[in-house]
Amino acid sequence: MKDRSLRCLSLFLLIGVFAPARGQSGGELHFCLHGEPKTFNPVLVDDEASENVRYLTGGVLIRLNRQSQALEPALATSWEISRDRRTITFHLRKDLHFSDGTPFSAEDVAYTMKLLMDPQTHSPTGDAFRSGEGSLEVRTPAADLAVITFPAPIAGLDRLFDQVSILSAHSPKKEMAVLGPFFVSDYKPGSYVLLARNPNYWKRDARGHALPYLDSVRLDIQRNRDIELLRFCRGELQLINRLDAEQFERLRHDNPAATRNAGTGLDAEEFWFNESPTAPLSEHKKAWFHMTEFRQAVSMAINRADLCRIVYGGYAKPAYGPVSPSNHFWFNSSLEDPKYDPKGALAMLKRAGFRYENEVLKDSSGNRVEFNLITNSGNAAREKMSVMIQQDLLQVGIKVNVVTLDFPSLIERMTRTLEYDACLLGLVNTDLDPDSQMTVWLSSGENHQWNPNQKAPATSWEAEIDKLMKEQASARTDQERKVKFDRVQQIVAEQQPFIYLINKDVLLAVSPALVGTAPVVLNPQAFWNAETLQLAAGTELGAHK
């Protein structure tokens, strides 16, 4: 480890870590995806790897500036929202083309929105726009004018379009024709995604130079975070979008100038029980997982402060619920701190009919309370958290078997076979606004993980959340919306469908060979301004072989 640290340090010294670098155009940026992209179709994206590709390739009508958190014109030069907040009118840039040369027009906006809102598409992005019964109407009075009318008012309507990558209605390349700074030029499953500079990208810098500066971006698929850090130290990668605390401390010790802490993030680590009625689980397990008192007791038995201190080295805060305290406006500050109370947890379980005998918890039928907790292999922090949760729950007589799976296998169990008891993963928040979480909170949503794709709400509290989420989306003022979303957060705190654990600090690694980075808490934290990133003058511009 010492030799590795010295090699890492000497590399940064050699490339001038202590001197401000000047950028040059061209070259290939290298960093990693931590899983296989599930899709390159932007309307179907619901995983982090696919989202990263979408962000780098997709052209949107409106872009949320991740640094200022203000909306900026993109493919639309301007827009107006009607007083009833049902209609948004976009004035589009003229003479733009997709990456394959296909002209861009209002027809493409209409095509994208209709596909997004088609129930047969099952678009997670489309869920954010579902505010009421009825169909979408899109008019295109001119090639540079698109008028979109929704069946019910939507608050924060313009912010939602940051997630809508416009597809071509006519390109033979379908979703592979894009309007963003890069396009997918090569993909080798299990190895890499190669993005090439889009020669038709519309944006220019202040001096009138065409963007992006980079020729290409190579996204290596690397689930092992230690290997990723080693490659960064070797100079094979120029950034790591998220470091765990141990890696951050290791790198900070060797070369603090290569580390960045953007502050407490918006994302949460959480786990949930499988409550799907079609899951191939025993009936007694289904009964436990459906029981509110069981979920509450499990939450109370977990020592979140220890998770923050031991797993994250203090670079994390205990999580209150679905909204990070860093999201100042939407966070419900009336929520109580997560309590660590194993004695209270055991008392609650006993009141719910469980028995504690010889340090073993049993249900009323004599079944030992035992379940499997799955998480993704190669993520050291989640593996450590799983073991600590295992130890905490053993104190109340619950036996937890930790099962680590490669990410494709984990996703297969979560979304297709439903062969799991409980799962520990992270929730990535792409925006500050609660409308971006529609696919999580609507009972019909694909990311309503504990019981997804419900035809009707399975519980009265889920029905209330459905109602509140739709009402807040059409409320007249942000204050009205906040009252309703505060109530959603309160219900979630009471029912514990997700057991929120911690909010991590946003920890990153940025090579001095990369110029123009400005890390933020909003995803994607390190490369939100990818079109203006440059390699430092003197850096080898050739592609990595």
Regions found by a protein language model. Give the residues of each.
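Bacterial N-terminal signal peptides that target proteins for export
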Residues: 1-9
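Bacterial N-terminal signal peptides
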Residues: 8-17
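Sec/Tat signal peptide C-region and signal peptidase I cleavage site
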Residues: 19-23
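Surface-exposed binding/hinge segments that line
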Residues: 24, 91, 125-171, 186-188
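Extracytoplasmic
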Residues: 26-28, 34-35, 56, 74-76, ...
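N-terminal lobe/hinge region of extracytoplasmic solute-binding protein
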Residues: 32-83, 114, 177
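A structural "hinge/loop" feature
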Residues: 35-52, 75-77, 102, 124-127, ...
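Extracytoplasmic/periplasmic ligand-capture domains
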Residues: 67, 93-124, 138-139, 172-173, ...
